[in-house]
Amino acid sequence: MSGHPTVRDDPDDVMVRRAATVGHRMAMGPGEPALTEWAAAGLALPDETAMMRYRLDRIVAQMADDDLDGILLFDPMNVMYATYAPNMQVWLLHNQARYAFVGADGRLVLFDYPGCGFLSAHNPFIHEVRPATTFTYFLSGGRTDEQAGDFAAEISDLLATHGGGGRRLALDSSTTLGVTALQDTGISLVEGTRVMEEARKVKGPDEITAMRCSLEGTRVACGKMFEAMAPGMSENQVWGVLWAEMLA
């Protein structure tokens, strides 16, 4: 594995300065050595703020095409697309404890763990962060029905306020309990995975720029892996080189 120099925070970085005063940070985007490698390859950096704006606009436009009043997202990939704010992506594939609502009027509400507002503070297009109301057994125990009812009532209120006047809500995934609770409020559910796939498949200019940077990072990492390969190495050792380079 290559010995990358220690990455040092830029004291002029807005998030670094903020972290010094509020005691936490969520730094999105690349650091060294990727920045130097991309500059050497003649690659520009994406405008992340413009990318966040574009993605929200894509979701709203797709909802308009499908005559939807809102969309509720549980899939961590879709939540990330809408909010550009990650949190326990793999764990949330099993426990639906974080979700996002987008209204027909463009209102974006992220439901996150209490005290986790800093994870999305970099996104100016998230209008509100609320504590998630969880209804999976792991998190709610014997109160799953009660919690599901509270969850559905909150989403129903959002749909009434920020929808297009109807009750059509797209939903990408949920448990049977979540689906039933939403329907009990009079919401008409629509399959939401297709809606998000249609929105996400049209890439904006900054997304394409980001993809070029990502591909260059992958090319460099694979090159380091090939250089490190030697007789007698295990697959895990070779794989470790790749991941060390990808995550550096």
Question: How should these model regions be labeled?
Answer:
Residues 197-201, 229, 233-236:
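Short, small-residue-enriched loops and turns at beta-alpha junctions
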Residues 215-225, 235, 239-243:
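Active-site pocket-lining segments that scaffold enzyme catalytic pockets across diverse folds
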